[in-house]
Amino acid sequence: MRVKINLKCSECGSLNYLTSKNKQNHPEKIQVPKFCPKDRKVTLHVES
């Protein structure tokens, strides 16, 4: 079952991306480097 999740910037805290994941296959929180338009640089985004 796929669920929708938000990816939050770890530096400024803004919610920049909406994605989905399968909680049965990946129960841990997602952490991916993405571009933050507020900081105007690539930062680590974590699942919120």
Curated annotation (Swiss-Prot):
Record family assignment: Belongs to the bacterial ribosomal protein bL33 family.
Cross-referenced PROSITE patterns: RIBOSOMAL_L33 (PS00582)
Membrane-spanning parts: none
HAMAP family, sorted: Ribosomal_bL33 (MF_00294)
Record-level GO cellular component terms: cytoplasm; ribonucleoprotein complex; ribosome
One Pfam family named in its UniProt record: Ribosomal_L33
Keywords for the protein's UniProt record, in alphabetical order: Ribonucleoprotein, Ribosomal protein
This protein's encoding gene: rpmG2
Listed GO MF terms: structural constituent of ribosome
Name of this protein: Large ribosomal subunit protein bL33B
GO biological process terms on file: translation
Ribonucleoprotein in keyword set: yes
Keyword field contains Ribosomal protein: yes
